[in-house]
Amino acid sequence: MNLKKVKRAIISVSDKSNLKKILPTLKKFKIQIISSGGSFKKIKSMKYNCTHVSKYTKFPEILGGRVKTLHPKIHGGILNIRKNKTHQNDLKKQNIQSIDLVIVDLYPFEKQIKIKSKKLIEYIDIGGPSLIRAAAKNFNDVTVISDINDYFQLTKELNINKGSTSIKFRKYMSAKAFGVTAYYDSVVSDWLNNQLSIKFPIRKMIHGKLIGRLRYGENPHQQGGLYKTSENLGIDKIHGKELSYNNYNDIYSALSILNTFKKNEGAVIIKHT
């Protein structure tokens, strides 16, 4: 199972609503917590021990909070390979402690696009993706949690393994984390391209979030899943059983035909081939 003991965690989250679900478990296994900004204040307000990142790094937050966790003592603590003697000697020389767990979610950039925030540029996260990617790269030694919906899985993993995580769990969370940052970057890229009215960018990312599994794919023996982009699907299912891949193709055909009508009146009947 290649278990790794979690001794130290860094927490930096935008959505703090689920912290209460994970903090008791971290306390149970005596896991030291490092945090910053609003996350630090929230953790302290809930009466849990927590070290401010500035106290740990001995370097203050600067640029109005734009630079908080971008520091060698943080990233060195995450990226070091535990079995590499050179890495461990570097840590000793610089008084850096290993960080075994990274709990980070990103600024809600996509949400701010929808409400047309005037401060949208400030929601482009830099420190968060850096922490996530560093931890995800070093999955052999570090656990990364990039989705607040995974707190239950983390607590379950720590309880089963008595304060440790398995390589299977770390690798799964690593794959998920790279998906999170890739999706996030693609949303930012699309927004900038739209600002410049660039219709055919050199690189175009098609990004989506899984809504759910379909009844089946194109054929009954095949599997299918439905993903949505940053835009709303714009449809509601009123009645009937779960939809299949072919059903969604039918819906697309119907909507395409409806869009050709000049008036907002009409009906389309579709029978798929």
State each model region's role.
Residues 101-122, 126-165, 223, 228-235:
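A short, charged helix-loop
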Residues 152-157, 162-273:
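Active-site loops and adjacent core secondary-structure elements that bind or stabilize anionic groups
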Residues 38-109:
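Glycine-rich nucleotide/cofactor/substrate-binding loop typically near the N-terminus or early
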Residues 4-8, 28-31, 46-49, 72-75, ...:
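Short coil/turn connectors at secondary-structure junctions
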Residues 1-33, 38-56:
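N-terminal glycine-/serine-/threonine-rich phosphate-binding loop
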Residues 15-16, 31, 37-41, 54-58, ...:
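Short, ordered loop/turn segments at secondary-structure junctions
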Residues 12, 79, 102-107, 145-146, ...:
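Short beta-strand segments
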